[in-house]
Amino acid sequence: MKKIKIKDKNMTKFIIVRHGQSKSNEGGYLAGVTDVPLSSLGEKQANAVCQYIINKYKIDAIYSSPLERACNTVKGVADALDLPIIKEDNLIELDFGELEGLTLEQIKNNFDNDYGKWANDPGVYVPKGGEAMSHLQARVVEKLKEIAKKEGEKTVLVGSHSSVIRALQCYIQGLPLEKMKNTPWVVNASLAEINFDGENFYIFKYGYDGHLVNLF
């Protein structure tokens, strides 16, 4: 992973959080762009990650996917610091098209060929009526650069989703999306610390979940 010492360059620091467990995660079905709330465990995870962030970082601004599960995961920080949550459509999860709302078992039984393609190559396969991962990656990178230009040398909290974080990791590491299936999974309410110096992104933390240890 690309790394650089913060003191070497002026940077925007992004703390990017995957939402806490949602009702769809709990129920084992794909939500994608469908708006679903956090589960009771997800609410506890959100509280834990917010407390960690408040204690660890000086957050200057908060952005989020417009979906409830992402916004409510970072709401604790917004409330504690009296900061608005700026909702950005380009930080939203991947649109799974006709697979939205289906369990993995339903996908396997009804879209067997699609299930195999998706399971084996999530970075490349595009579900019917859905979004390509390459499009998601491009919109996320563009939006983060736009935020960095606006916020400057600040620490920015971002509430988002697993596909967003994994696609961003591929971009930063220069990996083709064909390799996305080999990137580490990011659990609910874990976070990534990623800096941007105006030209390049650098990963300092990825999938950090130490704040969740007492919840299990």
Feature-to-residue mapping (PLM):
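Acidic, low-complexity terminal tails and accessory targeting/binding regions
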Residues: 2-12, 94-109, 149-154, 170-216
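Short, hydrophobic/glycine-enriched beta-strand segments
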Residues: 13-19, 158
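Active-site-proximal alpha-helix that buttresses catalytic centers in soluble enzyme cores
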Residues: 21-87
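Short active-site segment of divalent metal-dependent hydrolases/proteases
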Residues: 22, 164-165
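Surface-exposed helix-capping loop/turn segments at secondary-structure junctions
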Residues: 55-61, 149-156
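Active-site signature of alpha/beta-hydrolase-fold catalytic machinery across serine-
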Residues: 76, 167-171
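Phosphate-handling substructures
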Residues: 79-139, 195, 202-205, 216
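Short basic (Lys/Arg) and small-residue
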Residues: 161
